[in-house]
Amino acid sequence: MNGDETKKVESEYIKKHHRHELVESQCSSTLVKHIKAPLHLVWSIVRRFDEPQKYKPFISRCVVQGKKLEVGSVREVDLKSGLPATKSTEVLEILDDNEHILGIRIVGGDHRLKNYSSTISLHSETIDGKTGTLAIESFVVDVPEGNTKEETCFFVEALIQCNLNSLADVTERLQAESMEKKI
């Protein structure tokens, strides 16, 4: 696919899976990452609502309430030092193993991300002739008092971009290790 075709495919997935209803005091954005690892491998990491620290570098610990991972599950996340927060309480809103979509909503914590929700969807694609994954993550959040929409979006986009880059690093490394074992 050329650049225009890729943008068209991305746009279709965004329209289908990443629509957020915004009010005036909120901001929203969508980020895209092309990952050189197959969809099943990337999804096996992303779908683990109970282990986000496997690829999210700012999370040090996660405890899920209850034993079953399902829509409505709640997790308590401890954040690494250096961030303007130490903990977050999050609810699993979407877990679709067929469409490869995970959605969360933040319901508590000592941070300023009020009414935050995000959706990540994964889609199979071909990268350099090999099976890869298109990861799309979108969010909506209230703009905290004293901040602008631009500042808020910039901050959240930076966090998500770090998470997506880490997801690519982790899954591409796992894919390379898997290929080495086959040789």
Curated annotation (Swiss-Prot):
Site feature: Involved in ABA binding: P57, I104, V156, L159
Chain segments carrying region START-like: 20-172
Marked site: Involved in interactions with PP2Cs: P84, T148
An annotated Gene Ontology molecular function: protein homodimerization activity
GO cellular component: cytoplasm; nucleus; plasma membrane
InterPro entries reported in the protein's UniProt record: Plant_def-hormone_signal, Polyketide_cyclase/dehydratase, START-like_dom_sf
Glycoprotein listed as a keyword: no
Intervals of motif Latch loop: 111-113
One Pfam family it belongs to: Polyketide_cyc2
Keywords of this entry: Abscisic acid signaling pathway, Cell membrane, Cytoplasm, Disulfide bond, Membrane, Nucleus, Protein phosphatase inhibitor, Receptor
Top-level lineage group: Eukaryota
Subcellular localization(s) per the UniProt record: Cytoplasm; Nucleus; Cell membrane
Record's keyword annotation contains Membrane: yes
Disulfide bonds: C27-C153
GO biological process, one term: abscisic acid-activated signaling pathway
Residues engaged in binding abscisate: 56, 85-90, 112-118, 137
Extent of motif Gate loop: 81-85
Family as reported in the entry's similarity comment: Belongs to the PYR/PYL/RCAR abscisic acid intracellular receptor family.
PANTHER family xref list: ABSCISIC ACID RECEPTOR PYL10, OS08G0374000 PROTEIN-RELATED
Subunit structure, as described in the record: Monomer. Forms heterodimer with PYL13, thus antagonizing PP2Cs-binding and ABA-independent inhibition of PP2Cs. Homodimer. Binds ABA on one subunit only. Binds to CARs protein in an ABA-independent manner, both at the plasma membrane and in the nucleus. Interacts with ABI1 and HAB1, and possibly with other PP2Cs, in an ABA-independent manner.
Domain comment quoted from the record: Upon interaction with ABA, the 'latch' and 'gate' loops change in conformation leading to a tight dimerization and the creation a surface that enables the receptor to dock into and inhibit the PP2C active site.
Biological function: Receptor for abscisic acid (ABA) required for ABA-mediated responses such as stomatal closure and germination inhibition. Inhibits the activity of group-A protein phosphatases type 2C (PP2Cs) in an ABA-independent manner but more efficiently when activated by ABA. Can be activated by both (-)-ABA and (+)-ABA.
Protein name: Abscisic acid receptor PYL10
Gene name, Swiss-Prot/TrEMBL: PYL10
